[in-house]
A protein has these predicted regions:
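Amphipathic alpha-helical elements of HEAT/ARM-like alpha-solenoid repeat scaffolds that form extended
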Residues: 31-51, 77-90, 113-126, 149-162, ...
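Alpha-helical solenoid scaffolds in large eukaryotic transport, assembly, and signaling factors
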Residues: 6-10, 22-81, 85-98
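Extended alpha-helical scaffolding segments
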Residues: 119-120, 125-203
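Short, Lys/Arg-enriched, disordered terminal segments
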Residues: 1-23, 181-186, 200-203
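Extended alpha-solenoid scaffolds built from HEAT/ARM-like alpha-helical repeats
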Residues: 2, 12-16, 45-49, 63, ...
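Amphipathic alpha-helical scaffolding segments comprising HEAT/armadillo-like alpha-solenoid repeats
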Residues: 15-19, 49-69, 92-106, 128-139, ...
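Helix-loop junctions that connect tandem helical modules in alpha-solenoid scaffolds
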Residues: 17-30, 65-76, 104-119, 139-148, ...
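Alpha-helical adaptor scaffolds
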Residues: 83, 87-92, 101-145
Length: 203
């Protein structure tokens, strides 16, 4: 039988411990739950390993996270950590994307200081409404925190640069020109200029 190395085993034990504590969240205060979630959120973002797959695709646990999110709707720190946890569990480990999970992401799309964490993962969910694709994308750059919102929007522009609808190209180019002007190094300025050229060439 293959021996799991100690480093991996320690991570497995930590994930199991945090999941077990969160499964029994009713025994803890709001602050204690928030602290547990802050620790757990780091685990699906950590280096991917086959050994973690069964833990991160546990739908029963994901549903408990949704239950916690519903109970503490006004706690943005809790919402952010749950959105990040579930998003990474889906994208990195293949957690089943249920209607309840998708609806939870949609509910938080435009919540101040929370919506940007939705934007990191929502475009990659299977149920993402393609007809509102670019209408939603164009709103991401104006979310808060500003730096994270602009980085997320820039990543999306990069991934879909040949698909930008004509009606949005002017606004995207204006955003890129502003980023270019604010860039304090030649490499950054060249990067934004190349993106602009790519968009213009597609017209």
């Amino acid at each position: 039988m293959h021996q799991i190395n100690r480093k991996i085993q320690n991570k497995i034990d930590n994930i199991k411990y945090l999941q077990n504590e969160l499964m029994n969240f009713k025994n803890f205060s709001e602050d204690e739950i928030s602290n547990l979630l802050q620790k757990f959120e780091k685990t699906p973002r950590d280096e991917v390993s086959f050994y973690f797959k069964a833990l991160f695709t546990n739908l029963e646990f994901a549903n408990v996270l949704l239950e916690i999110a519903d109970k503490y709707k006004e706690n943005k720190k809790i919402q952010i950590n749950i959105l990040s946890s579930i998003g990474n569990m889906i994208r990195r480990y293949g957690l089943e994307e249920t209607d309840e999970i998708y609806d939870y992401f949609k509910t938080n799309m435009f919540i101040k200081n929370v919506g940007v964490y939705v934007a990191i993962h929502l475009p990659y969910l299977k149920r993402f409404e393609k007809e509102n694709f670019w209408e939603y994308f164009m709103k991401i750059k104006d979310m808060t925190p500003k730096k994270m919102a602009e980085t997320t929007f820039l990543n999306i522009v990069n991934e879909h640069i040949t698909e930008i609808p004509n009606e949005h190209k002017g606004e995207v180019i204006a955003f890129l020109k502003q980023k270019q002007q604010n860039s304090n190094n030649e490499g950054g300025q060249k990067y934004y200029q190349e993106l602009i050229y790519t968009i213009l060439r597609g017209e």
